[in-house]
Structures are given as structure tokens and as C-alpha cells.
């Protein structure tokens, strides 16, 4: 899929890059193959298929994220969608994500979900950086090129690890923080400082919190304890940090607490590093 009206620029220009991806897509596909969601067929009416399901997910994502806009580049990757936006579109992107996540919650709250159709969960990764568009004669299409394209994909790929739905880089946060602070529908929480797999420079990650998430208040209420635990983690107080992270997991039910507690255990058994600065080097995508 290519938006033929977008202004493809061969020179680098600052853009916002968004990846959103359907989680558990392989499990959903296998469930369809086992006719778990086939429902009841009636004369002239076929059962709901995986092809129809994934098309509906893509079409809804495309429409709610408004990827057909003339200044937006959009492309479908398997069960996910990438959108590339002008750098001044931060507020516009927040509104679009809000609509899509609200639509997703309405869909999942339907009594028929899990019976005739699968529940869905979509993860997001967003960053900002320089992008150029290169024309490929092989498929006669323009394709985006830029480090931030890979960065957004990596961020989305680890969003589930942190129990985060919308994971964003500090680069995108700088564009969006003014809107986040002034709109009560949104908030954010600090997540981590890491080096993404295949990258060389550290990045700071935040989760964009949205009030249509059932755990919106839970995540906001956990931020003070998480900040305390993370400070101890940075000071190499592994035992105390692990206990606090584990408490976050147990009391708030947030997976990030368990992830960070296990990381502290690994670090406590590793040789002491005098240059430790709290930055974790990711080994997985």
C-alpha cells in the first residue's frame, strides 16, 4: 500500500514514525485454523475468517490513524502498519491513537468477543528523526529510509516486554509533552534507558498513558514507587531495587515490575562494572 499523494522527499527531513502491530497474531491465526471463532454458519452466510479479521484490523487502523492523509506515508507490514508523519503532527497523532484505542476497547468489551471473534491488543512504537524516501525500480514504489524507521519498529517490538501499549522515545516525547500536560485524557510514565538491539546510542523510553485504558489510573499511581526503585537500580542497589520492582508487580499487577526485578537479579550476579550508568543493552528486538 502506498499513498501516491504524499510528498516523497529524496533529501532527509524530520518526521515522526509510528509502528502499530497486532499482538498474538500467530495464536489468533492458529485459533482460526482450528475453527475456534467459526461461529454458527447459516444458509448463505459464511463463518468469519482470519482473512476478514486481519483485513478489518488493518482497515480500522488505517482509518482511525488517518493514514490516508496527503502528507502521511503509510505501509502495511504483515499484521502491522507503519505511518510516517510531518514533525508538527504530534497532537494529530495523539488524537488518532486515542480514537483507535477507544475503538479497540469498545470492540473488546462486546459480549461476543472471545466467542465469535478474537479479542485484540495492539502495541505502538513511536519516535522521531530524519527520513528520506528512495524510489525502488524493483517494485516501482517509494520506501522510507532512516535510522528512526528501524528505531520505531524496535520500540514497538519491546512494548509488550514493558507491559506498555504505547511506547515512545524521548525524541517523540519532546514534540508531544505540551499536549500531554494540557489534556487530561493523556499522561505518561518513565520506562527505561536502554540501547536498542543493533543501535549504538542510548534512548529514553516513556509510555503514553490514555484514559480509555482500563489500567490508566493504576499505571499513574505506580509511578512514584517505580521512580524510587529505578533510582536504586541506577545506584546498583540490586537487592532493594528488586524488592521494590517485585512489589510493583504484585501490588499493581504491572509486568514491568517483574521484568526489572529479574534484571536486577541478573546484574547482581554479574561482575561489578565501575562505569555502570543505568543504561541496559537490549539483546532482543
Residue ranges and their predicted role:
Residues 4-95:
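Catalytic NTP-binding/metal-coordinating core of nucleotidyl cyclase/transferase enzymes
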Residues 17, 123-124, 165:
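A residue-level structural signature of the nucleotidyltransferase/glycosyltransferase Rossmann-like core
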Residues 51, 94, 146-152:
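Amphipathic alpha-helical transducer elements in NTP-driven molecular machines
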Residues 63-92, 108-147, 171, 199, ...:
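Catalytic core of nucleotidyl cyclases, primarily class III adenylyl/guanylyl cyclases
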Residues 100-103, 107-110, 151-162, 179-182:
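Conserved, well-folded catalytic cores of nucleic-acid-processing
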Residues 160-238, 246-247, 252-263, 267-273:
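Cytosolic regulatory/linker segments at or just downstream of nucleotide-handling modules
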Residues 273-285:
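Intrinsically disordered, low-complexity, charge-biased linker/tail regions
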Amino acid at each position: 500500500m502506498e499513498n501516491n499523494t504524499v510528498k516523497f522527499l529524496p533529501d532527509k527531513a524530520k518526521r515522526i514514525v509510528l509502528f502499530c502491530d497486532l499482538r498474538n497474531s500467530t495464536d489468533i491465526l492458529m485459533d482460526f485454523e482450528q475453527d475456534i471463532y467459526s461461529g454458527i454458519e447459516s444458509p448463505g452466510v459464511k463463518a468469519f475468517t482470519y482473512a476478514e479479521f486481519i483485513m478489518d484490523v488493518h482497515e480500522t487502523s488505517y482509518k482511525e490513524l488517518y493514514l490516508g492523509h496527503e502528507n502521511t506515508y503509510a505501509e502495511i507490514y504483515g499484521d502491522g502498519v507503519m505511518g510516517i508523519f510531518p514533525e508538527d503532527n504530534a497532537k494529530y497523532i495523539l488524537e488518532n491513537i486515542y480514537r483507535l484505542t477507544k475503538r479497540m476497547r469498545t470492540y473488546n468489551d462486546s459480549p461476543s468477543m472471545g466467542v465469535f471473534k478474537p479479542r485484540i491488543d495492539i502495541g505502538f512504537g513511536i519516535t522521531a528523526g530524519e527520513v528520506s524516501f528512495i524510489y525502488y525500480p524493483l517494485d516501482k514504489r517509494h520506501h522510507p529510509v532512516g535510522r528512526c524507521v528501524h528505531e520505531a519498529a524496535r520500540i514497538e517490538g519491546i512494548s509488550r516486554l514493558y507491559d506498555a501499549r504505547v511506547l515512545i522515545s524521548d525524541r517523540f516525547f519532546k514534540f508531544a509533552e505540551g499536549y500531554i500536560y494540557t489534556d487530561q485524557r493523556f499522561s505518561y510514565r518513565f520506562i527505561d534507558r536502554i540501547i536498542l538491539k543493533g543501535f549504538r546510542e542510548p534512548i529514553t523510553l516513556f509510555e503514553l498513558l490514555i484514559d480509555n485504558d482500563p489500567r490508566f489510573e493504576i499505571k499513574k499511581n505506580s509511578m512514584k514507587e517505580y521512580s524510587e526503585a529505578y533510582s536504586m537500580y541506577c545506584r546498583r542497589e540490586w537487592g532493594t531495587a528488586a524488592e521494590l520492582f517485585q512489589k510493583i508487580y504484585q501490588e499493581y499487577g504491572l509486568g514491568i515490575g517483574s521484568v526489572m526485578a529479574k534484571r536486577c537479579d541478573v546484574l547482581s550476579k554479574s561482575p561489578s562494572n565501575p562505569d555502570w550508568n543505568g543504561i541496559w543493552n537490549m539483546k532482543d528486538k
